[in-house]
């Protein structure tokens, strides 16, 4: 596992965006051979999306031959709702870059047959071979996507019941009213994430410090689903300074020395 220790949330977003752009450009995608990118929602990736849009406008990257799969979507929330992940992605990213509409894949939380929707999502991912890079965030309790604590590390795309803590955390997007936050969501599984060629997780803020410590220094444990990254051959965790407060000094020193050349100029 790589740990990229940075100072601020803005630096995390810029580093992540630069990494994505470098991966896309090195891949040299075409119509017949697209780059497949997994994407998250929430507050954490906003700085990365902003940086990606700026780099696109500067002519540094094109998304014409990029196919995206989003991590999750609320169940029962109309896609036109301002807090649906469909709306979030268009508002913060898709509407500002040159990605074709047919290349965008989002789970349908209003599908008449939820199980079929989840199966078809997995099948569509497999039809592209694999996701080349999956970017994600992490919850205070260590969840990735909506794989809440005790999720199977072999799980696939499915419906999940959201914990009360997750709904409280997300209520900030619903005028602070937890009762407006859906109780269920569709989410890619831990196994889906582990199938990706590379997984990059962004970690911001002191409230994520325990999750980061569990990911880097703890054991693989389904109560901290972020710890699944230890099983992945190409996992990258990009974090800000407040999120590292639970790490041992020698752990942080080790990764700072290891990644010194990769964090210059931010």
Curated annotation (Swiss-Prot):
Pathway connected to this protein: Amino-sugar metabolism; N-acetylneuraminate degradation; D-fructose 6-phosphate from N-acetylneuraminate: step 5/5
Activity-regulation annotation: Allosterically activated by N-acetylglucosamine 6-phosphate (GlcNAc6P).
Keyword terms: Allosteric enzyme, Carbohydrate metabolism, Hydrolase
Residues annotated as catalytic: 72, 141, 143, 148
Signal peptide as annotated in the record: none
Organism whose genome encodes this protein: Salmonella typhi
Job of this protein: Catalyzes the reversible isomerization-deamination of glucosamine 6-phosphate (GlcN6P) to form fructose 6-phosphate (Fru6P) and ammonium ion.
InterPro entries in alphabetical order: Glc/Gal-6P_isomerase, Glucosamine6P_isomerase, Glucosamine6P_isomerase_CS, NagB/RpiA_transferase-like
One Gene Ontology molecular-function label: glucosamine-6-phosphate deaminase activity
Family classification: Belongs to the glucosamine/galactosamine-6-phosphate isomerase family. NagB subfamily.
GO biological process, alphabetically ordered: carbohydrate metabolic process; glucosamine catabolic process; N-acetylglucosamine catabolic process; N-acetylneuraminate catabolic process
Record field: catalytic activity: alpha-D-glucosamine 6-phosphate + H2O = beta-D-fructose 6-phosphate + NH4(+)
Cellular component aspect of the GO annotation: cytoplasm
Assembly information from the UniProt record: Homohexamer.
Site residues (Part of the allosteric site), renumbered to this chain: 151, 158, 160-161, 254
EC number: 3.5.99.6
UniProt name for this protein: Glucosamine-6-phosphate deaminase
Class in the EC hierarchy, top level: hydrolase
């Amino acid at each position: 596992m790589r740990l990229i220790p940075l100072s601020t949330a803005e630096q995390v977003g810029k580093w992540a965006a630069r990494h994505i752009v470098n991966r896309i450009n090195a891949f040299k995608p075409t119509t017949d051979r697209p780059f497949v990118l997994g994407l998250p929602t929430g507050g954490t990736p906003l700085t990365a999306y902003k940086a990606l849009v700026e780099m696109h406008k500067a002519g540094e990257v094109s998304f014409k031959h990029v196919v995206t799969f989003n991590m999750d979507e609320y169940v029962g929330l109309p896609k036109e709702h301002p807090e649906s992940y469909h709306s979030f992605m268009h508002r913060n990213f898709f509407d500002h870059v040159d990605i074709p509409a047919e290349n965008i894949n989002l789970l349908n939380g209003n599908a008449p047959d939820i199980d079929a929707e989840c199966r078809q999502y997995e099948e569509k991912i497999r039809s592209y071979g694999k996701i080349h890079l999956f970017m994600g965030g992490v919850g205070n309790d260590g969840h990735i996507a909506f794989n809440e604590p005790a999720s199977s590390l072999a799980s696939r795309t499915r419906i999940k019941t959201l914990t009360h803590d997750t709904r409280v955390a997300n209520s900030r997007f619903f005028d602070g009213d937890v009762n407006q936050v859906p109780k269920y969501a569709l989410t890619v599984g831990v196994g889906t994430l582990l199938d990706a060629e590379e997984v990059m997780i962004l970690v911001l803020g002191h409230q994520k410090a325990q999750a980061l410590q569990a990911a880097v220094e703890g054991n693989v444990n389904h109560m901290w689903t972020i710890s699944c990254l230890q099983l992945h051959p190409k996992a990258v965790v990009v974090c800000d300074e407040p999120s590292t407060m639970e790490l041992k000094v020698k752990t942080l020193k080790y990764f700072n020395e290891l990644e010194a050349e990769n964090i210059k100029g931010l």
